[in-house]
Amino acid sequence: MMKFVVFLACLFVAAHSFAVEGEEEYFEAEVPELERAKALPPGSVCDGNESDCKCYGKWHKCRCPWKWHFTGEGPCTCEKGMKHTCITKLHCPNKAEWGLDWRSEESERSPC
């Protein structure tokens, strides 16, 4: 009986280790290539259909002219946003690229 319990425990550990290894590969593939690319500096042209993570820093987002949503005219640029921008960019995969200054002010209380 004891050998059977040990065998089941080993089988469970082996199955769990393969499942965890597969999840890591899944999470790496989940991040789109464009979000892993270098961040754009403030004022540069960006694509309004993509994530704001491509704009450098926690406060900058890709802002488009109001008529862009209807006609697609005019370039979108990386411009300073508001606190909501910072909150949504907390989970960006490329925030390590921004350096330590991405959390410089209010570092003891909140990252935003």
Curated annotation (Swiss-Prot):
Keyword annotations from UniProtKB, A to Z: Calcium channel impairing toxin, Disulfide bond, Ion channel impairing toxin, Neurotoxin, Presynaptic neurotoxin, Secreted, Signal, Toxin, Voltage-gated calcium channel impairing toxin
What modifications does the entry list under PTM / processing? Proteolytically processed to yield the major and the minor chains.
**Signal sequence span per UniProt?**
1-19
Whether Signal counts among this entry's keywords is yes
Q: Which InterPro entries match?
A: Toxin_34
- Positions the record marks as coiled coil are none
Which positions carry the propeptide annotation? Answer: 20-36, 103-109
Q: Does the keyword Endoplasmic reticulum apply?
A: no
Q: Which molecular-function annotations from GO does this UniProt entry contain?
A: calcium channel regulator activity; toxin activity
Q: Name one Pfam family in it.
A: Toxin_34
Tell me the compartments it is located in: Secreted
- Give the CC-aspect GO terms: extracellular region; host cell presynaptic membrane
The organs and tissues expressing this protein are described as:
Expressed by the venom gland.
Concerning its family, UniProt says: Belongs to the neurotoxin 04 (omega-agtx) family. 01 (type I omega-agtx) subfamily.
Listed under subunit, the entry gives: Heterodimer of two subunits, a major chain and a minor chain, linked by a disulfide bond.
Please describe what this protein does. Omega-agatoxins are antagonists of voltage-gated calcium channels. They block insect neuromuscular transmission presynaptically. This toxin is a blocker of L-type calcium channels (Cav/CACNA1).
Please state what the protein is called.
Omega-agatoxin-1A
Please give the organism.
Agelenopsis aperta
